[in-house]
Swiss-Prot record:
The gene is rplP. Keywords: Ribonucleoprotein, Ribosomal protein, RNA-binding, rRNA-binding, tRNA-binding. Pfam families: Ribosomal_L16. Part of the 50S ribosomal subunit. It comes from Coprothermobacter proteolyticus (strain ATCC 35245 / DSM 5265 / OCM 4 / BT). Binds 23S rRNA and is also seen to make contacts with the A and possibly P site tRNAs. NCBIfam families: rplP_bact. One of its GO terms (molecular function) is tRNA binding. InterPro entries: Ribosomal_uL16, Ribosomal_uL16_bact-type, Ribosomal_uL16_CS, Ribosomal_uL16_dom, Ribosomal_uL16_sf. It comes from the Bacteria. One of its GO terms (biological process) is translation. GO terms for cellular component: cytosolic large ribosomal subunit. This is Large ribosomal subunit protein uL16. CDD domains: Ribosomal_L16_L10e.
Length: 135
């Protein structure tokens, strides 16, 4: 799973996901992109699940790019622990997604396959996504 090699601070505040995305709005590498319509936090397990879907469905001729990286720690206190005692330990790594962010890009596939991949990826993420194309 994806995670940073090292970070300056182990525990951080959660970033805001209000408003629209200002970066990562255009296709940079592939012919098709999977763009977020909703907002939410994507963790490294979700990204890995989407990567497996793309790798299985693209085949040997296609190529894919992952344009997001989980570099924010998500902390959680253990179960049945009383209030206080500081912030919990990091549990997973997340990436905050706002509407408009292109998360994955594909090339070397036809439009039907790209639509199928976008549909499968939409089931794995906690918000709605759509397929965009360069053409």
């Amino acid at each position: 799973m994806l995670m940073p090699k090292r970070v300056k601070y182990r525990k951080n505040h959660l970033p805001h996901i209000k408003g629209k995305e200002t970066r990562g709005l255009k296709l940079a590498f592939g012919d098709y992109g999977i763009q977020a319509v909703g907002r939410g936090y994507v963790d490294s397990r979700m990204i890995e699940s989407c990567r497996v879907i793309m790798a299985k469905n693209i085949g040997k001729t296609g190529k894919y790019w992952i344009r997001i990286f989980p570099d924010v720690a998500w902390t959680k206190k253990p179960l049945e622990v009383r209030m206080g005692g500081g912030k919990g330990d990091p549990e997973k790594w997340i990436f905050p997604v706002k509407p408009g962010r292109i998360m994955f890009e594909l090339t070397g596939v036809d439009e039907d396959t790209a639509k199928h991949i976008a549909r499968l990826i939409g089931f794995r993420l906690p918000f709605e996504v759509r397929l965009i194309s360069r053409v």
